[in-house]
Amino acid sequence: MNKKDFIEINKNGWNTLIINNKPFSNTILPEYGPFLKRNENEMNIMNNINGAKVLDLGCGEGESLEYLFNKGAKEIWGLDISKEQIKKAKIRFPQFKDNFLVSPMEEEVNIPNNYFDYIISIFSIGYTSDLNSTFKYSYKYLANGGKFIISWTHPFYYCLDIADDKVVINKSYFNEESEIITKGPDKVNLVQNNMMISTVLNTASDNGFYLDKLYEEETILKDDVNGYKSTFWRKEKTVNCPSTIIFVFKKH
């Protein structure tokens, strides 16, 4: 799928989800992913958040940024492909309304360079049409010593399915082709990528980052994600496989 179509499907899809105002599975801080035993309150990955400047890639309505602001972040910025989500983020943060921009994360925007203490991508990195560009621009925006924190579905979890009440492997871990998925009760189309761990690590390294931490957290057995029951997120699959992988990259 070409980049233009990829972006257009996701832009329209997220706008539709917000306009329809129906529940869908969503991950926001302090949670890093579905079913995890620990969240940011226990993990303390952003241990220097007080007074920090934070940029959220795929910020949605600003819920994760609200958590960080309440924890002491001084300045918050957000990018999102959905104008409907950005509208809600600006309402949530009228004092920072000029800091919320409608844009794909993989395109350069007019925000300060060498500026942010933290850049976060909480369950949004798989919706980029260009992983390399996302890392490239994130490196430009981040201050020296700053951290880029990414959480996303564990790539092996993508390979699992349930058939005849058994967990089976039905996809290749090596398949990184983009695919159409549906989200929410109305089954709205979105496009996402499954990325091997090595792909993420190598792309980050190619753009100047080094890996500071990698987390594969244990899960708890639940039937819903923040109250929403999903056919993809199933407790049976998390018994022996992490639902989420968390990368913490650092800029030299």
Predicted segment positions?
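Short alpha-helix
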Residues: V191-L214
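Core SAM-dependent methyltransferase catalytic element
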Residues: N207-F209, S230-H252
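Acceptor-substrate binding/catalytic loop of class I
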Residues: W152, F156, G184-T199
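Class I SAM-dependent methyltransferase SAM/SAH-binding core
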Residues: L55-L57, E61-E108
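A short acidic, Gly/Pro-enriched loop at the edge of an enzyme's catalytic core
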Residues: N110-I119
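A short glycine-rich, Lys/Arg-flanked "PGG" loop and its adjoining helix->strand segment in the class I
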Residues: N132-K147
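Conserved class I S-adenosyl-L-methionine
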Residues: M1-N50, E63-Y67, F148-E179
